C-alpha cells in the first residue's frame, strides 16, 4: 500500500479511539490504505511503523494521534531515507491529542474528522520546515513544532511519568504541570548562541526553540514563529523567580510575554546550547513533548524539508 494510517488510540485521553470510525468513514474516498494501531508499552511505535512503511514503498503517512505520535512518524520517515525520504513522502496529520499545538501553528483543522475530510477532498501538500537536534554522541532527533529545555522539559518529564494526568485532566494537565514544575524549579546557568550573535550567558528558567508558535497545550510561546520561513523563533526566559514565573503564565498563553524584562527573543537557523560553567546537573531537552536528551546540543533547521498535507 502507498498509504499508512497510524492510530494512537490513547491520544487525547481516548479522543483518537472515539474518532476512529468517523475518520475511517471520512477517508473512504481515498485509495485503499493500511492501518497500524499503536499498543501501550512499546517504545516509539509510530516511528517504527512509519519507517517500515516507507522502506516498503509508502509515499504517504497519516497520523491520527497527538503531537508526539506525529513527531515519531516524522523521525520514522527520516530514518528510512534521510532528507530524500522527507522530500518524497507526505505526512498528513489528523490531530487528536491533548494539546494539538502543531496543528494550530500549521493551520490544520484541530478536529480529526474535519482534517480527514480535508485530506479526502484532496488537501494540497505544502513544504514546511523541520528542526534537527544533534548531540555530541552522534544521535540526531527531528522535531516539527518546538524543542525546549529548562522548566519546560521538566513539565514534559512530569507528563511522561504521569500519563494519567493528561487522560483525566486533558489540556488542563499542561497548566497544572506547569505550575507544579515552575514552583519547584530554579534557574540554571546556560550558554546560548543564536547564529553568529553574541552568546547569551546567565541563569535560565527555560529556552524554547520554536518552529511553530504554540506548545504546552495552548501556550503562545513564540508569536512570530512560522513553520515555513526557514527560521526558529528562540525565546529565553531568564532569571525568573518562582512566584514571578507562575504569575506570568497568563501572559504566556496570550503571547504577550515578550515585554517581560526577563524574556528575550531572537530568530536564527542554528542554535548552540550548553550548560554554564560549573553546571553538573543534566539539563534535559524535550522535543514535541518528548524527552530526547540533554545539553549540550546543536539545533538546526531543514528549510522546506517536509511535504505536509494540509
Predicted regions and their residues:
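Short conserved active-site loop signatures built around small residues
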Residues: 67, 207
